[in-house]
Amino acid sequence: MQPRRPDRFDGLEYRGTSWGRGDGDVPPYQSSFPARSLSSSGDLSQQWVTSPPDIPGSRNLHWGEKSPQYGADSNAGPPAFGEENSGSSGEQVNRFAGFGIGLASLFTENVLAHPCIVLRRQCQVNYHAQNYQLSPFSIVNIMYNFTKTQGPRALWKGMGSTFIVQGISLGAEGMLSEFTHLPRELSHKWNLKQLGGHLLLKGLVYVIVTPFYSASLIETVQSEIIHDNPGILDCLKEGIGRVLNLGVPYSKRLLPLLVLTFPTVLHGILHYIISSTIQKCVLFFIKKRSPPQLPAEGSNAVQNKLEDYFPELLANFAASLCADVLLYPLETVMHRLHIQGTRTIIDNTDLGHEVVPINTQYEGLKDCINTIKREEGGLGFYKGFGAVVVQYTLHAIVLQITKIIYSSVVQTAR
């Protein structure tokens, strides 16, 4: 389990001076050049920038970085009227592109991909299925059958609960980091102690999220044919009831939360490590292959700066894809353990117009692995893998469309 979300939300503030942190006085005026007195020298260390929202795909400046200068002469006077308008237009295009690209990435990962996630989970927990749905074409066919018999809502069920789980994860991480002083992020010069504390924080977050993730999983896989639409806060109520052993009575085969915690934390930590490592490697190779560019002026500066967004999007895409593929067998086992004993009835992924109950009797992680291997074979761990192919194909198409739109915006800005 690895919710896709922004790592931080510090991109909505001014950074670069004490005023940007709320400690000092307001600068004399706000333009694309730093304010200076008549006796100032060519030192530009006291400059400030405004950064776009820190959402996936944006490239914020951090402490110690400097914004590109539009003029090389340190003794130049105030900008002319035309130059000021050009800088303002370039800044607007920069903000629009950063926000639009990040918004497109968030939409793809959390909204457009949700039908694929629903089918992927249903196939993973359906131990009755004879068709393993390994091909993307079979996934598209079953999507059509579900939509035809149950309507479009059958592919979007449980989407609200996934956002609730992400919100709980973000809130828990922030509160735990505040009270335990465990690092939420690693600096460039990290050591083993910081790494251990950071992974410990992630593990504690997954422990807290486990009961709510289990409730969200039930909402995404249960059939719409025999179940009414759940409320927005049902995920919270079910998660709290699972912790306190209250609410709807479950089967005796329901596994305790302690049994579910280990595979959930293991999957979350491994997913985070793999995705973070691949993301940094992809960015490193892209930066190594790209030749360094000299500071440009006008629309060329906007073009060069906005092109920095796409390596990050590509790195996020590759990181998520590799982590999902490598950990797919573990995810299948984890979902089967979570769904056992919850009296959940899912759609028949072989036919698309019937329902089947979940009546597994796994005793734990090891028993689940051995049972799947014995009864369904090695490919049983990859049931529904075609949904992953469809999901990331759609993601790649959206990235390409976003790049085309971005190029058109830059050409128009010129």
UniProtKB/Swiss-Prot annotation:
Solcar repeat positions: 92-183, 307-412
Coiled coil residues, start to end: none
Function of the molecule: May play a role in mitochondrial dynamics by controlling mitochondrial membrane fission.
Membrane topology recorded in Swiss-Prot or TrEMBL: Multi-pass membrane protein
Subcellular location: Mitochondrion outer membrane
Transmembrane segments: 99-119, 159-179, 198-218, 254-274, 310-330, 379-399
SUPFAM superfamilies attached to this UniProt entry: Mitochondrial carrier
UniProt KW keywords: Membrane, Mitochondrion, Mitochondrion outer membrane, Repeat, Transmembrane, Transmembrane helix, Transport
GO biological process, one term: mitochondrial fission
Family: Belongs to the mitochondrial carrier (TC 2.A.29) family.
Biased composition range(s): Polar residues: 29-50
Region (Disordered): 1-89
Protein name as annotated: Solute carrier family 25 member 46-B
The species this protein was found in: Xenopus laevis (African clawed frog)
A GO cellular component annotation in the UniProt record: mitochondrial outer membrane
InterPro entries from the UniProt entry: Mitochondrial_sb/sol_carrier, Mt_carrier_dom_sf, SLC25A46
Biased composition (Basic and acidic residues): 1-13
